[in-house]
């Protein structure tokens, strides 16, 4: 696969010096960044070149997300937290199914990618649906299966069972592309 060079006016390499580079070249080979720096220092390039507007920087990370809830956006706006949770969100979430979570995650992933977010840490139900949607979208995913039931009188043995299920989930999905 050919290396594609992207040229931009500015770039933020996120190095230890907190640099802001001008006239930046970014080389991508096989879907991975192969080189980034000032264009004047770039290696010889004979492949396709794309001129970009704006700033080149690493993708952002959403460190706390419940993306399938995009389907519930606007429900109960303006209510106090506990009223919103108990009267609006939890009843609606109780009616959701894996396909709802799949479509909600697809929508959430599309919105994040359009905003420059390339990784998300998700905490939600129907974990397999979230994995599927994330793989389809090409967004990186860290997922923590829900354990909220532990806060609602769940027995110790049931909590241990859920933790075991979480460990099994991790074994199944950790680095699914490798």
Give, region by region, the residue ranges found by the protein language model.
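Short beta->alpha connector loops
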Residues: 11, 123-127
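A cross-domain feature marking catalytic cores of carbohydrate-active enzymes
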Residues: 65, 123, 143-147
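Short acidic/polar active-site loop segments enriched in Thr and Asp
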Residues: 118-119
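Metal-coordinating catalytic core of metallo-dependent amide/deamination hydrolases
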Residues: 129-178
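N-terminal metal-binding scaffold of metallo-dependent hydrolase/deaminase domains
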Residues: 1-44
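Short loop/helix-cap segments at secondary-structure boundaries that form the rim of catalytic
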Residues: 39-46, 132-136
């Amino acid at each position: 696969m050919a290396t594609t060079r992207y040229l931009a006016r500015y770039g933020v390499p996120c190095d230890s010096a907190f640099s802001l580079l001008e006239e930046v070249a970014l080389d991508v080979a096989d879907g991975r960044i192969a080189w980034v720096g000032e264009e004047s220092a770039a290696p010889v390039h004979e492949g396709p070149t794309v001129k970009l507007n704006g700033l080149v920087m690493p993708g952002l990370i959403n460190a706390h997300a419940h993306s399938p809830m995009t389907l519930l956006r606007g429900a109960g706006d303006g209510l106090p937290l506990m009223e919103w949770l108990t009267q609006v969100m939890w009843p609606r979430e109780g009616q959701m199914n894996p396909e709802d979570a799949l479509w909600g995650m697809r929508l959430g992933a599309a919105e994040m990618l359009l905003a420059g977010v390339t990784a998300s840490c998700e905490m939600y139900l129907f974990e397999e649906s979230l994995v599927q949607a994330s793989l389809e979208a090409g967004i990186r995913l860290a997922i923590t299966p829900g354990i909220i039931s532990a806060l609602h009188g769940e027995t110790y043995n049931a909590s241990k069972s859920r933790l075991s299920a979480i460990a099994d989930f991790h074994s199944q999905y950790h680095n699914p592309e490798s």
